[in-house]
A protein has these predicted regions:
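Extended repeat-based scaffolds of very large eukaryotic assembly and lipid-transport proteins
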Residues: 6-80, 84-89, 96-168
Length: 168
């Protein structure tokens, strides 16, 4: 009876180990957890949602070790923020391995919102199609976008080959 009812509502995030993550990052993660990922412009009035600013704040203010730890958080939105934050850090060296890890990280999908459209996708689809812009089958990159992530052509090809193995 009771155990079954309680276990059906269990969230893995309840027992997440926050050691090594500062309180202000934890507080922002807890708020960001249910907001999905936003391109920055949503809705009819093309407003920038607070979730976009929150995501940017976490990526900018979390340390490399905090972001690495957050790639293990049991929520797709937070994992995506952590992966993207590491990819965007110029000093982070293991980007290819990290992205390959993200490609195989399929347990938690995310909700991505852009313009008036929201859609569910895997973390890898968000990273490859809307952060890295390396798949020619994906939406075009924004005007003026350059690959500023330090990935060589062979690294991008390796990432793309692994990404294309995942059923969409």
């Amino acid at each position: 009876g009771i155990v079954v009812v309680l276990s059906s509502f269990y969230e893995k995030s309840w027992i997440y180990d926050w050691n090594g993550i500062r309180q202000q990052i934890k507080d922002s993660v807890k708020v960001a957890e249910y907001g999905g990922i936003s391109s920055g412009v949503v809705g009819i009035a093309a407003k920038r949602p607070k979730q976009f600013d929150r995501r940017v704040w976490i990526m900018k203010n979390a340390t490399e070790s905090e972001l690495l730890k957050l790639t293990e958080y049991p929520n797709g939105t937070i994992k995506s923020i952590a992966y993207e934050g590491l990819i965007r850090k110029p000093e982070f060296k293991n980007k290819t391995d990290l992205i390959l890890k993200a490609i195989s990280d399929t347990e938690y999908p995310i909700e991505f919102q852009s313009g008036c459209v929201g859609t569910n996708m895997n973390i890898s689809e968000y990273l490859v199609d809307f952060v890295l812009y390396i798949d020619d089958k994906s939406p075009p990159s924004p005007i003026g976008f350059e690959n500023t992530f330090g990935l060589s052509e062979s690294e991008r090809n390796k990432i793309l080959a692994e990404y294309r193995k995942i059923p969409s």
